[in-house]
């Protein structure tokens, strides 16, 4: 596990296009408290995050993630917690992020990105 890198971006798929809410910070263990995660409880207690915008856009195309409509680009800071590279079959640049209570949506530097780039009109 490494401390979140200072000023490095981390991308997270979010429910709405242009706003990250407290609901976007809920882990699987919080969303599904009665589920038995077994040996994966450590991963279920963190947030799925991605290292590049391209990875975020690619993951957003997966059927089980279609309910997510935006991408938050979070400028990370060491006090935001720890993260670990946890590659999956769908993404080699998948990270699990365990945020601290110092991560504050109202004060964090967050930019919002479109899931799909719209072609420019000619």
What function would you assign to each model-found segment?
Residues 1-47, 51-122:
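Conserved NAD+-utilizing ADP-ribose enzyme module
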């Amino acid at each position: 596990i490494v401390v979140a890198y200072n000023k490095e971006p981390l991308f997270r798929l979010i429910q709405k296009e242009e706003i990250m809410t407290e609901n976007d910070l809920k882990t699987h263990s919080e969303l599904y408290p009665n589920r038995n995660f077994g040996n994966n409880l450590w991963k279920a207690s963190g947030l799925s995050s991605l290292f590049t915008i391209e990875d975020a856009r690619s993951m957003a195309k997966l059927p089980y993630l279609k309910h997510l409509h935006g991408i938050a680009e979070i400028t990370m800071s060491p006090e935001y917690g720890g993260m670990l590279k946890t590659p999956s079959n769908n993404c080699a640049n998948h990270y699990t992020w365990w945020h601290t209570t110092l991560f504050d949506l109202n004060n964090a530097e967050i930019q919002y990105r479109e899931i799909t780039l719209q072609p420019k009109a000619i």
